[in-house]
């Protein structure tokens, strides 16, 4: 660790809730959607916990927030920040349009990239260096990770997804989707996916919380339900074998916590990969 070393910390609302002294010179809230309500009890308390990241900042610090986020805008009207506020425009950035790395084509990752550009500008990072890194970035494991791709089939492992909002971007960015979802849903979570995407998706619900997911998908997206992930994957591969030359996407984006059957999302992602490897050998 050197004097100029920059630490990048992802602080959860769980950590921020009880934090009194943690502060960062560059604080960023990318977006806010209903999450962890089972922990914080109300959406308002969840928002307050997130905003502690910015409220603890000093006068010479910078607070980065998404420009058009309704919950962020609402909270900003209620509080006073000591730091300088920078509203990040996540739409219409010409630089982002030039990026051809497929990992950054989803709406969510375009938003992430908008924040990266704004913060790197303040850190005086050379644009040429940044472009090189972005173009060659392979993504993180179990976060919209393409684990298999051939002419007619793409398989994406997005085990990190623990809410509907975290699945929206990847659902919008792909076609002919076989969507695997299940686990422990977030209290009060709702699927806010525009209607035009419904016909593009067939859902395969697995696990004990089927009723919750069926309620959210019913009348919107075609679905089948299964007792476990293995049975759901088996059914998808049966369909793909019959339609081998039709482009298909298998998307594992559970939209729920993993603790019903797994130690964590990494354990869940690893298990998915093992099942996929087995069924690919049978194609």
Which functions belong to the PLM regions below?
Residues 10, 30, 46, 64, ...:
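Residue-level signal for inorganic ion chemistry
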Residues 13-15, 34-35, 68-70, 162, ...:
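Short glycine-rich anion-binding loops that position phosphate/pyrophosphate groups of nucleotides
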Residues 79-95, 131-135, 145, 224-230:
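Beta-strand->loop->alpha-helix junctions that form or flank phosphate-binding loops
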Residues 190-248:
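C-terminal helical cap/extension that packs against the catalytic core
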Residues 255-282:
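Glycine/aspartate-rich loop-and-adjacent alpha/beta segment that forms the canonical ThDP
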């Amino acid at each position: 660790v050197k004097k100029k070393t920059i630490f990048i910390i992802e602080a959860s609302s769980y950590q921020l809730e009880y934090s009194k002294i943690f502060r960062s010179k560059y604080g960023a809230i990318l977006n806010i959607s209903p999450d962890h309500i089972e922990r914080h009890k109300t959406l308002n308390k969840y928002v307050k916990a997130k905003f502690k990241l910015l409220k603890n900042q000093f006068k010479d610090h910078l607070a980065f927030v998404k420009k058009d986020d309704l919950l962020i805008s609402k909270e900003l009207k209620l509080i006073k920040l000591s730091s300088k506020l920078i509203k990040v425009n996540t739409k219409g950035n010409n630089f982002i349009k030039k990026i051809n790395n497929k990992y950054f084509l989803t709406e969510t990752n375009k938003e992430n990239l908008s924040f990266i550009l704004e913060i790197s500008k303040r850190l005086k990072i050379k644009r040429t260096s940044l472009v090189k890194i972005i173009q060659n970035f392979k993504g993180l494991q179990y976060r919209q990770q393409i684990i298999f791709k051939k002419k007619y089939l793409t398989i994406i492992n997005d085990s990190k997804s623990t809410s509907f909002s975290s699945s929206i971007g990847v659902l919008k960015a792909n076609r002919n989707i076989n969507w695997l979802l299940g686990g422990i849903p977030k209290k009060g979570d709702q699927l806010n996916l525009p209607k035009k995407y419904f016909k593009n998706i067939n859902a395969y619900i697995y696990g004990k919380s089927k009723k919750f997911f069926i309620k959210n998908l019913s009348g919107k997206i075609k679905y089948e339900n299964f007792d476990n992930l293995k049975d759901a994957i088996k059914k998808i591969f049966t369909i793909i074998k019959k339609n081998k030359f039709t482009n298909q996407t298998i998307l594992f984006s559970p939209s729920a916590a993993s603790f019903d059957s797994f130690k964590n999302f990494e354990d869940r992602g690893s298990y998915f990969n093992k099942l996929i490897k087995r069924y690919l050998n049978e194609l």
